[in-house]
């Protein structure tokens, strides 16, 4: 070891552990390779050849996101193998809402101490998310930052790039109209938003125990990975069957639904038209959260909403195993109306 390496190690940065992380994650990255990827892991930049795609007028669409304080629960439970799926899901679900097929993904991990076994689990989850989305994991960065983070802490963010045929871009503001049917695709759980409130509600609970409302431990319920909707929606986008898409994340129904239609319309949602997952009932009960406010924070069991023409609604509902949760109407009051 050189003097400079020894000095760096004394400052808290373990270069050798960093090399080990790279060595460990290569097999996970390799599983995600797809047509268009150029080069191998370890270059200064990841490369992708767009010319191999059957797209006449390609439009690149990008998205970036993190996992929020759901990470704190993963760290507390020492369970790191699915949090990477969440990171990918938050990014690719956003770009599929614009009509994009995910092409590639990059991750960024910042930590107080490089622990190769743990970071391998995180990246394995990222790779699994990429597989579910059909995206290649073409690069990333792991930054060891002693003094910035405690040794056990880390943060995770991701960046997705996708492509859409210009004529198939989802433009709900232009295409969604009164009378269109709203179909809801079930969520897998809380997904990756609202966790600062979730942690507060369950701060004094034993996370390894269950609740009367749940069929598994509380921690397993809270760490259920975010569902990725790419493979369900992409074929329908290419068939021009979808007029608008809303990814129900932070801000719940009230913030995200209006992002897929114009100011002259309202989304009329019929409460009781889908199965609200037990974890949301538990949050409302134990957190003493107002029922109306739940729709302003959480997905309530619906992770993605699509607007479709009435004549296509029945077939698409069956194909997607979706719920018919409401319709678009001319605006007379708020942008989103929850009808009991």
From Swiss-Prot:
Gene3D superfamilies: PurM-like C-terminal domain (3.90.650.10), PurM-like, N-terminal domain (3.30.1330.10). Its EC number is 6.3.3.1. It is an enzyme of class 6 (ligase). It is found in: Cytoplasm. Keywords: ATP-binding, Cytoplasm, Ligase, Nucleotide-binding, Purine biosynthesis. GO terms for biological process: 'de novo' IMP biosynthetic process; adenine biosynthetic process. It catalyses: 2-formamido-N(1)-(5-O-phospho-beta-D-ribosyl)acetamidine + ATP = 5-amino-1-(5-phospho-beta-D-ribosyl)imidazole + ADP + phosphate + H(+). InterPro entries: PurM-like_C_dom (IPR010918), PurM-like_C_sf (IPR036676), PurM-like_N (IPR016188), PurM-like_N_sf (IPR036921), PurM_cligase (IPR004733). Its main location: cytoplasm. Pathway: Purine metabolism; IMP biosynthesis via de novo pathway; 5-amino-1-(5-phospho-D-ribosyl)imidazole from N(2)-formyl-N(1)-(5-phospho-D-ribosyl)glycinamide: step 2/2. GO terms for molecular function: ATP binding; phosphoribosylamine-glycine ligase activity; phosphoribosylformylglycinamidine cyclo-ligase activity. One of its GO terms (cellular component) is cytosol. Belongs to the AIR synthase family. This is Phosphoribosylformylglycinamidine cyclo-ligase.
